[in-house]
Amino acid sequence: MIPMKRERMLTIRVTDDEHARLLERCEGKQLAVWMRRVCLGEPVARSGKLPTLAPPLLRQLAAIGNNLNQTARKVNSGQWSSGDRVQVVAALMAIGDELRRLRLAVREQGARDDS
C-alpha cells in the first residue's frame, strides 16, 4: 500500500506549558503522528510503561492467574459434568470481568501518579 502524501499543513498555537504537556503525553513518539492519531480516533500504541504495583499485589494477581489457568484446564479436560462446567465457566467469566475492572483501575491510578 502506497502511503498517502500529506499536502496540507495544520498550524496551532500553544503555550510553553501546553507544548510540554503534549510532548509528555505522546511518550516519545513523533508529536505530529501522535496528534493525528488521537484527533482522528485511530489507535495509539501504548508505550508499554505500566504503573508500579506493590509486590504483594503482584503476587496475588499472579496466583489468581495461575488458579484460573488450572481451573480452565480442568474444565477443558472433560472430567466434570456439563452442569458443573457451565457453573465454573460462569464463575470464570465473572472473575475475568473483575480482573478487567481491576486492570483499568490500576492503569487509571498509574496515569494519576504520572501526572
Swiss-Prot record:
InterPro entries: MobC (IPR008687). Pfam families: MobC (PF05713). Keywords: Conjugation, DNA-binding, Mobility protein, Plasmid. GO terms for molecular function: DNA binding. Coiled coil: none annotated. Consists of two domains: the N-terminal domain, which contains a predicted ribbon-helix-helix (RHH) DNA-binding domain, and the C-terminal domain, which comprises a signature shared by nicking accessory proteins. To E.coli MbaC and MbkC. Required for efficient mobilization of ColE1 plasmid and is thus essential to promote the specific transfer of the plasmid during conjugation. Probably functions by inducing DNA bending, helping the MbeA relaxase to melt the DNA around the nic site and cleave the phosphodiester bond. Binds specifically double-stranded DNA (dsDNA) containing the ColE1 oriT but does not recognize the inverted repeat (IR). Homodimer. Interacts with MbeA and MbeB to form the relaxosome. This is Mobilization protein MbeC. It comes from Escherichia coli.
